[in-house]
UniProtKB/Swiss-Prot annotation:
Residues 88-191 form a coiled coil. The gene is thoc7. It comes from Dictyostelium discoideum. Keywords: Coiled coil, Cytoplasm, Nucleus. May act as component of the THO subcomplex of the TREX complex which is thought to couple mRNA transcription, processing and nuclear export, and which specifically associates with spliced mRNA and not with unspliced pre-mRNA. The keyword Cell membrane does not apply. Pfam families: THOC7. This is THO complex subunit 7 homolog. GO terms for cellular component: cytoplasm; nuclear speck; THO complex part of transcription export complex.
């Protein structure tokens, strides 16, 4: 969660900083073209019509570049925000699942301990019962022994089932932890990609500013 929060804050800071720098640069460039356009329209130069057409074309192109750059920046920002929110929601979901698994494992451990004690009591009772009835047992005694043996078998089966379920939940819990680790690893790998996308956008804007103007 801390990593996701930091990623979101860094992304917002980087976006707004780049947006301010880009906005100032583009506005200055467009304004410069606009001033040149105004100077030509108010001048008495014989070639003013040719210059006016050329500057008008350049000004339109600058506005086109501005619109395209803004669309690119907006698309990148929306994509990064959507991905960050997705990973944040996925991480919260995994944390909830892990907490639920922990609670279920704790309950299963308590159940297993209780059943082990019950089995121990039954075994002690059966051993004592057999010791008391060392002589040939009557029909009633045999029924009691058979009943106690049946209860012992049921407790043994239930204990085995609980043990198997506990092992399964433990494996599922370990899988959830592994999934969360993979999620954090993917986030770590996505940070350079986001920063690289922002750097590429800045480089593209810089290249446009260095392009010679048509005369």
């Amino acid at each position: 969660m801390k990593l996701i929060k930091k990623l979101l804050e860094d992304e917002e800071d980087s976006f707004f900083k780049n947006k301010i720098v880009f906005k100032n640069f583009v506005i200055k460039k467009v304004f410069k073209k606009y001033l040149q356009f105004i100077n030509v329209t108010t001048g008495n130069n014989e070639n003013s019509s040719v210059d006016l057409q050329s500057l008008c074309t350049q000004l339109i192109n600058e506005f086109g570049h501005l619109e395209l750059s803004v669309q690119k920046a907006q698309t990148i920002s929306e994509t990064c925000t959507d991905e960050t929110l997705y990973y944040q929601q996925l991480s919260k979901q995994r944390e909830i699942e892990i907490e639920n698994e922990k609670k279920e494992i704790a309950i299963l451990k308590e159940t297993l301990d209780y059943e082990k004690k019950q089995r121990q009591y039954k075994e002690q009772y059966l051993a004592l019962y057999k010791a008391i009835n060392e002589k040939p047992s009557t029909e009633q005694t045999e029924k009691e022994i058979e009943k106690a043996q049946k209860e012992l078998n049921e407790i043994t089966d239930q204990t085995n089932k609980t043990t198997s379920k506990l092992e399964l939940r433990t494996k599922q819990f370990q899988l959830l932890l592994h999934t969360l680790n993979e999620l954090e690893k993917n986030l770590d790998e996505s940070i350079p990609f986001i920063e690289n996308s922002n750097n590429n956008n800045n480089n593209s804007n810089s290249d446009q500013s260095n392009t010679p103007m048509e005369s």
